[in-house]
């Protein structure tokens, strides 16, 4: 068990973001659950350490009279990752990050997303680049949602983002990894963590992302909209771990023709 733990994930194979090490490579969102109790149960079952929160849609102290997500996802147990979901302009995204910093007592780690279209929820990459530059200058540690364009991903890294998060497919679509070679190219060229963000639908999608060499996966809808969210959270945890181990192990080469698994020399009755 100790060997598997060291090689396949955990303390011997940490995910490091903005100088902090995490044992889990599964990051989860908090939207779309039926209630806060289900949110807590799913997050716990996933084994996640980083939990993302939509500041514009979730109460984390903005409304003292209402239940707060932080009551069930306490910041002393989890790293809270405020995100700018629902922002379509640079100004809104930057303002939302600054609000999160105020609400969370100087919190620096944020997930930036600037959307360009309400139908696809694809990122507006021009606005994303501009917002990233502003936030990095303002002292934020920026994890950034982007498309699967390797050139844009590299530019965001050069700006100073601490992690690049390309979509695998449209947010909430569950379509899986649509352009694996684009994701692979981003991974191969990156010097910061690459985490697939959006598009995962089931455990096999998460495993594929990790097998490509991604450092982690962030998901919400795939767990929250499952028939049994808590059970799906467990499945995703195992898929992330299995995919990471497979990547570290190194898959066999693909071959066009068969290759016998048993030696031909020394056959009985030969």
Swiss-Prot record:
Catalytic activity: [ThiS sulfur-carrier protein]-C-terminal-Gly-aminoethanethioate + 2-iminoacetate + 1-deoxy-D-xylulose 5-phosphate = [ThiS sulfur-carrier protein]-C-terminal Gly-Gly + 2-[(2R,5Z)-2-carboxy-4-methylthiazol-5(2H)-ylidene]ethyl phosphate + 2 H2O + H(+)
Residues that coordinate or bind 1-deoxy-D-xylulose 5-phosphate: 172, 198-199, 220-221
UniProt-annotated catalytic positions: 111
Top-rank EC class of the record's enzyme: transferase
CDD domains attached to this UniProt entry: ThiG
GO cellular component labels: cytoplasm
Keyword Cytoplasm recorded: yes
Superkingdom in the source lineage: Bacteria
Cellular compartments annotated: Cytoplasm
Pathway of action: Cofactor biosynthesis; thiamine diphosphate biosynthesis
An MF annotation (GO) of this entry: thiazole synthase activity
EC number in record: 2.8.1.10
Keywords (A to Z) from UniProt: Cytoplasm, Schiff base, Thiamine biosynthesis, Transferase
SUPFAM superfamilies in the record: ThiG-like
Pfam families in the record: ThiG (PF05690)
Main localization category: cytoplasm
Chain segments annotated as coiled-coil in the UniProt record: none
BP GO terms, sorted: thiamine diphosphate biosynthetic process
Assembly information from the UniProt record: Homotetramer. Forms heterodimers with either ThiH or ThiS.
Function: Catalyzes the rearrangement of 1-deoxy-D-xylulose 5-phosphate (DXP) to produce the thiazole phosphate moiety of thiamine. Sulfur is provided by the thiocarboxylate moiety of the carrier protein ThiS. In vitro, sulfur can be provided by H(2)S.
Family (UniProt): Belongs to the ThiG family.
Annotated protein name in UniProt: Thiazole synthase
Taxonomic classification: Bacteria, Pseudomonadati, Pseudomonadota, Gammaproteobacteria, Methylococcales
Encoding gene (name): thiG
């Amino acid at each position: 068990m100790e060997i598997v733990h060291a090689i396949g994930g955990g303390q011997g194979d940490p995910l490091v973001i903005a100088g902090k090490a995490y044992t889990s490579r599964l990051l989860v969102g908090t939207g779309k659950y039926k209630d806060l109790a289900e949110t807590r149960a799913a997050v716990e079952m996933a084994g996640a350490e980083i939990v993302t929160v939509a500041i514009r849609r979730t109460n984390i102290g903005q409304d003292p009279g209402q239940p707060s997500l932080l009551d069930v996802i306490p910041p002393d147990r989890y790293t809270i990752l405020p995100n700018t979901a629902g922002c379509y302009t640079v100004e809104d995204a930057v303002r939302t990050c600054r609000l999160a910093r105020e609400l969370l007592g100087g919190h620096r780690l944020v997930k930036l997303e600037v959307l360009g279209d309400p139908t696809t929820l694809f990122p507006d990459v021009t606005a994303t680049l501009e917002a990233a530059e502003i936030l990095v200058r303002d002292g934020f540690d920026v994890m950034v949602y982007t498309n699967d364009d390797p050139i844009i991903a590299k530019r965001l890294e050069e700006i100073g983002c601490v992690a690049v998060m390309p979509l695998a497919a449209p947010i909430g679509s569950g379509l899986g990894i649509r352009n694996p070679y684009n994701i692979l190219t981003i991974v191969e060229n990156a010097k910061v963590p690459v985490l697939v963000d959006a598009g995962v639908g089931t455990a096999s999608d998460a495993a594929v992302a990790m097998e490509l060499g991604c450092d982690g996966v962030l998901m919400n809808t795939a767990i929250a909209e499952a028939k049994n969210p808590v059970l799906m959270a467990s499945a995703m945890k195992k898929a992330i771990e299995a995919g990471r181990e497979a990547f570290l192990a190194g898959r066999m080469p693909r071959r066009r023709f068969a290759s016998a698994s048993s030696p031909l020399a020394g056959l009985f009755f030969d």
